[in-house]
């Protein structure tokens, strides 16, 4: 399997935008192939990338559970589910996208989850990078077979509430039994005139130090991000000199050599 890069943080802090900006970087740098996984049921990574979502892993799982005997003749359940998963995989010129979708309903999902998890693991082996946009609880990664994360980005906006959510996520890692090799905090929506971490508020930095995780990137407030959102444009079309694009590039170029 390629390198696993995970992004986690409180909803509304710029987590999915950060994930989309990373996909933008990898596609422009042409250092893929990359598989982007939208593992947050409330996320819209596909939308930020300008991709239409036809199906999700959650849809496949729920539809199968409603009619587990509805497998076409000549196929077994494993082959049928793998066929549906291949259909749910969105293939773009520079990246592929898999949407995990809705969470489980009632009933026993052990068999179908085992098949879907195994397929996802095998699929990920075909890519140089696996970028996972997570829900705050990190449930998707905790259920993966290996649980290995080469780089975990903990995303917060420039607020104590966002940072405290990062602290809670950080505190869950041991319980989730995730094998995290490297991690760092990404602060979004910082003032455009902020040059580096030395300009961050003292109370904010005190809480960062209490968490014990290094800040690896500052993503400035970028009016283009709001413009693109209002115009429903893909963040892949952002100009290369956009402040957010430049900041993401500088961050990833420092991180890639160490993972």
Where are these regions (language model features)?
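Active-site signature of alpha/beta-hydrolase-fold catalytic machinery across serine-
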Residues: 21, 25, 48, 144
């Amino acid at each position: 399997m390629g390198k696993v890069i995970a992004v986690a943080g409180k909803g509304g802090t710029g987590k999915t935008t950060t994930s989309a900006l990373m996909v933008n970087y990898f596609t422009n740098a042409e250092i893929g192939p990359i598989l982007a996984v939208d593992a947050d049921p409330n996320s819209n990574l596909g939308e930020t990338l300008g991709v239409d979502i036809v199906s999700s892993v959650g849809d496949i799982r729920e539809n199968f559970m409603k009619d587990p005997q509805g497998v076409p003749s000549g196929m077994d359940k494993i082959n049928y589910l793998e066929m549906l998963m291949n259909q749910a995989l969105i293939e773009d010129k520079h990246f592929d996208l898999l949407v995990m979708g809705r969470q489980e309903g009632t009933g026993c999902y052990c068999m179908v989850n085992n098949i879907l998890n195994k397929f996802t693991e095998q699929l990920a082996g075909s890519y140089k990078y696996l970028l996972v946009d997570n829900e705050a609880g990190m449930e998707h990664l905790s259920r993966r077979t290996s649980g290995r994360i080469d780089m975990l980005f903990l995303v917060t906006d420039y607020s104590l509430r966002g940072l405290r959510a990062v602290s809670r996520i950080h505190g869950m890692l041991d319980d989730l039994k995730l094998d995290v090799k490297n991690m760092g905090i990404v602060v979004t929506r910082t003032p455009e005139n902020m040059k580096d971490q030395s300009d961050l508020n003292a109370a904010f930095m005190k809480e960062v130090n209490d968490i014990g995780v290094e800040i690896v990137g500052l993503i400035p407030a970028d009016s283009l991000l709001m413009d693109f959102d209002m115009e429903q444009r893909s963040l892949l079309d952002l100009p290369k000199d956009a402040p957010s694009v430049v900041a993401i590039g500088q961050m990833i170029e420092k991180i890639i050599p160490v993972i």
